[in-house]
A protein has these predicted regions:
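Structured, contiguous alpha/beta core segments that scaffold functional sites
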Residues: 1-312, 316, 322, 326, ...
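C-terminal amphipathic alpha-helical
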Residues: 139, 147, 269-290, 308-419, ...
Length: 467
């Protein structure tokens, strides 16, 4: 009799070609990759220019943010900051408030020891191949395409920094599988990466980020759901439209047939000779840029039969535009940024804000939260006051428009000039008058001078000076 393991392996061999899935076995439990995640890269990002453009718009935003190591000095402000920064419609006023809370909650670590010094080094160069910004962007790219992001930490196994990462790598999520135990809830015990060989890592070494997955099967819910899975039909249609359009241009063949429909020419030989003469005349007299606009004349009745339809007539180009809009919606990217809808300065500015707040910041925040969780659990900094975060102040498109600020503050009856300068992002003026209320009459002046002037006017109705 076959052992239970042999029987399960036999089941795996039967299931793999039928399901298009990959399986691992841990204590008799099959763990399946829920769908062919490699296809989202092969048939999406690698060959579809719309998907490529959308994903890279997001990744370019992600690369902008610098990272730093902090210590928490105000837990309450940190919670408020995290709550604000998770909003996908962050207003300029809320953005300014978030910057203030971040400064109040976190203090940069400047005097590093051997442990925090290594962590600071990783925030510059996580491995031999990438900067930290590129490393974060690459991981987010996997998450956008496959729904999963795996960070492997090569932990030091001895010395003063034992348990601390010495390097960080992204595992390609399309070829990484989860190893799990049976039972409910399903428990992850490790991860398996299939490259030039099979590599297995305990769960303590890997940080796994994923999008929520409502699909339950053989532990399918342990994997994230790829956004492109919901757009699978749109991608398939768009790729087919591009193939049809390319085929039309590359294999154009005959566009039309010119025929003789003259009752006076009845014999086949005569029609053939006339067709031949017409062809020669068209080639010699009516082709080329210099002959554009010439009118051809024939003494015989002739006709034209069009063959096939153009991509415009087939509606391919219009369908591609709508596919682009739908794919933008999947990722929360404004379609103005890939040029499929009309653009003006104002809507491009608003689109850049939406790209940052709706697409880039959620990915950056997720990376930060998972990284800090691993530092406080498995990566050597349990119980220590260290906090990794990105600097959101570089996204200046989120701040309020200075012209709008000046416009509404100038309409106030009374305002302190330094308040106006601060709102506009300028440093306060040290002149004490700039901290006083100024009022708007015919012009602007300090409230104190305005009040003295009003008293003088009341005491001297004839505008006589008082000694």
């Amino acid at each position: 009799l076959k052992s239970l393991k042999d029987r399960i392996q036999g089941l795996e061999e039967k299931a793999l070609p039928l399901q298009g899935q990959q399986f691992s076995i841990v204590n008799g439990q099959l763990t399946a990759t829920p769908d062919n995640k490699k296809s989202y890269i092969d048939n999406g990002y690698s060959v579809n220019d719309i998907v490529y453009s959308i994903v890279n718009l997001i990744l370019d935003k992600i690369r902008v943010a610098p990272w730093g190591l902090y210590k928490v000095v105000d837990e309450s402000s940190l919670k408020s900051y995290n709550g604000l920064i998770r909003k996908k419609n962050l207003s300029g006023k809320e953005y300014k408030r978030a910057l203030s809370l971040h400064q109040k909650a976190l203090e940069p670590i400047t005097n590093a020891n051997s442990s925090t010094g290594k962590l600071m080094e990783l925030l510059k160069w996580p491995n031999d191949e990438e900067t930290y910004n590129d490393y974060v962007a690459a991981g987010c790219g996997y998450k956008l395409l496959t729904g999963d992001k795996y960070q492997w930490a090569n932990l030091l196994d001895m010395g003063a920094n034992k348990g601390i990462p010495q390097e960080l790598w992204n595992l390609p999520s399309q070829v990484t599988k989860i190893l799990a135990l049976k039972g409910f809830p399903p428990r992850k015990v490790g991860y398996q990466f299939e490259g030039d060989g099979i590599y297995q890592y305990p769960k303590e070494e890997v940080s796994h980020e994923l999008y929520w997955n409502p699909n339950w099967g053989i532990n399918q819910q342990l994997n994230g759901m790829a956004p492109l899975k919901a757009a699978l039909k749109t991608i398939t249609r768009n790729n087919s439209a591009k193939d049809a359009s390319s085929s039309k241009f590359q294999n154009n063949g005959l566009e039309a047939v010119i025929y003789v429909d003259e009752p006076g020419i009845s014999d086949a030989q005569g029609k053939h000779q006339h067709a031949k003469a017409t062809k020669q005349a068209l080639i010699s007299e009516y082709t080329g840029t210099k002959n554009q606009g010439k009118i051809a004349v024939s003494p015989y009745k002739m006709g034209v039969a069009n063959l096939g339809l153009s991509p415009v007539e087939l509606g391919i180009i219009e369908a591609e535009k709508w596919d682009a809009v739908l794919l933008c919606a999947i990722y929360g990217v404004p379609p103005e940024l890939i040029g499929v809808v009309s653009k003006t300065y104002n809507n491009v500015v608003e689109a850049e804000k939406a790209l940052t707040s709706r697409s880039a910041l959620p990915l950056l925040t997720s990376h930060r939260d998972n990284y800090n969780r691993k530092l406080q659990t498995d990566w050597g900094f349990r119980g220590q006051n260290v906090y990794v975060d990105y600097d959101v102040s570089v996204y200046t498109e989120l701040q309020e428009d200075v012209n709008q600020i000046l416009d509404w503050t100038n309409k106030l009856i009374a305002v302190r000039p330094n308040e106006q300068r601060t709102l506009a992002g300028l440093e306060a003026d040290p002149d004490p008058l700039m901290d006083q209320l100024w009022v708007t009459t015919a012009g602007r002046q300090p409230l104190e001078d305005y009040q003295i002037g009003a008293v003088d006017e009341a005491l001297n109705p004839d505008n006589e000076n008082v000694a």
